[in-house]
Amino acid sequence: MSYEKSIADNDIRIAQICENAKKYKIGVVLTAFTKGSKQPQNSAFVINKSGNILMKYSKVHTCDFADERDVESGKEFKVCDFEGIKLGIMICYDREYPESARILMLKGAEIILVTNDCGSMQPRIRALSTRAYENMIAVAMANPNGDNAGCSCAYSPICWDRNGKCVDNTVLLADDKTEGIFYAEFDMEAIREYRNREMLGNTFRKVEAYSQLLSKEIKEPFIRDGQNR
């Protein structure tokens, strides 16, 4: 993706999607390559039912080992208020790093929406279930169908009932080949009640032990080309 082909935030195509969101009274997460300061950014726009853009998020964890080495990384994770629900966004490779969902939880997100486009999905959907569990936050991901791909999914943070009995937190899990519109419904009242009583998320973290998370030092076996861009 070249900078010249990336689009501005006021591009007519974005405006058209906003108009349709208002017309059909639906929320939309729209992704596009947008103009960064010097390079394109992989961005997502959250549009409300009135056709207003609530938030623009640019992907933080760009795939610097592949074509996205020429894409400018976003600098922060963001949360917006959509119809009384706090929404956060992750884009594809963001979900490989637990810090992404953790920061969104700390910023107040109740649901994380994940726009995705990759294969080898089985370990990745299990990781999303874990992100929901450990942050007490709902997670939903959309991924294009295809061999070894697909698996659009949604997970509730509710993993056990009041008696401590485990419950399946899978709300939706598509197969890899089926193409379609998938619906996932979260019981926000139940989720909020669960978050108010259980002991995960930001309840008993020991942040004084976490300073190493901010170090930029990389040692073997994790040294790769294109790091610390």
How would you label these PLM feature ranges?
Residues 1-10, 40:
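Metal-dependent catalytic neighborhoods of phosphoester/phosphodiester hydrolases
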Residues 2-3, 85-86, 112-114:
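A short, structure-level motif marking secondary-structure boundaries and short turns
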Residues 6-8, 62-67, 82-85, 102, ...:
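Short capping/connector residues at structural and topological boundaries
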Residues 6-29, 96-183:
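CN hydrolase (nitrilase-like) catalytic-core segments centered on the catalytic cysteine
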Residues 19, 35-107, 116, 120-130, ...:
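Active-site catalytic loop in hydrolytic enzyme cores
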Residues 25, 33-36:
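Glycine-rich, aromatic-flanked loop segments that form ligand/cofactor-binding clefts
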Residues 32, 91, 143:
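A cross-domain feature marking catalytic cores of carbohydrate-active enzymes
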Residues 79, 144-229:
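C-terminal beta-strand edge segments of enzyme domains
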